[in-house]
Amino acid sequence: MYRTISRSSSGLIRQSTARLTRQLSTTRTTPSQYNSKLLLGVLGTGALAFGYFSQQSSLIQNASTAENIEKVFEEGNAVAKDAQESLDARQEKVIKENEQKTKKAEDAKTSSESKANVADKKSNSQPEGEPEGEGKQEAAFNPDTGEINWDCPCLGGMAHGPCGEEFKEAFSCFVFSETEPKGIDCIKKFENMRSCFKRYPEHYKDELYDDGEEEASTEVVEHVVLETSEPAIEQIEQGIKEDKVKPNTKSD
């Protein structure tokens, strides 16, 4: 009985071993087949990795290029903006300068026209024979009567001071004098005028004192008075030449 069991066991073991051997032989891979599969796996993984990194590198390069392009556009926009602002400023400056030139020209034209109108009005209102640019009160003589206008500002107000009468006599004598040198025959009248000035130094300080407190001579006083009333003398002498002023006109 023991033998029978032993044989049976041995038979089972052999059958199992044979079956396992066949299974191993059908599933076992040879070294060459294994190496080929390993190489394919490595190459596939490398290709995938290269593709991935190539794609990432391309994305990085594209992003960098896009940033550079954007930077260039920003710089270009800034330059264009500065150029436009500069152009606008220049145009505004030119416009203002043109406006100022136009305004100056218009003002000059208006001023010229205004002066011309004033001159025309004066010319139209001025009596014939009256010195140009002077009204009756400002003329040295009255063209209607031919008399000296003692109210003329050109006489310096000396005809109405404390020594007004003495001034009128001396002045009338000088402007109508026909001697050479002119006025030499009026010395006595100028001496009388100077004597009157000395009585009223507060009124005739400028005429009576020459450069300080020293009293001026009759000749100096005469010179100062005639120099002050020189515009009136010129007008009256011209009026005498044109026979518009009466010789030896008596003072008021």
Swiss-Prot record:
Motif Cx9C motif 2: chain residues: 186-196
Domain of life: Eukaryota
Transmembrane spans: 38-54
Cofactor: Cu(2+); Zn(2+)
Mitochondrial intermembrane side: 55-252
Topological type in the membrane: Single-pass type II membrane protein
GO molecular function (one): protein-disulfide reductase activity
Gene Ontology biological process terms in this record: protein import into mitochondrial intermembrane space
Subcellular location: Mitochondrion inner membrane
UniProt cross-references to Pfam families, sorted A to Z: CHCH
Keyword terms: Disulfide bond, Membrane, Mitochondrion, Mitochondrion inner membrane, Oxidoreductase, Protein transport, Redox-active center, Signal-anchor, Transit peptide, Translocation, Transmembrane, Transmembrane helix, Transport
Domain CHCH: residue ranges: 160-204
Subcellular location, principal: mitochondrion
GO annotations of cellular component type: mitochondrial inner membrane; mitochondrial intermembrane space
Mitochondrial matrix side: 32-37
Residue ranges, annotated region (Disordered): 90-143, 230-252
UniProt motif Cx9C motif 1: location: 163-173
Subunit-structure text: Monomer.
Protein name per the record: Mitochondrial intermembrane space import and assembly protein 40
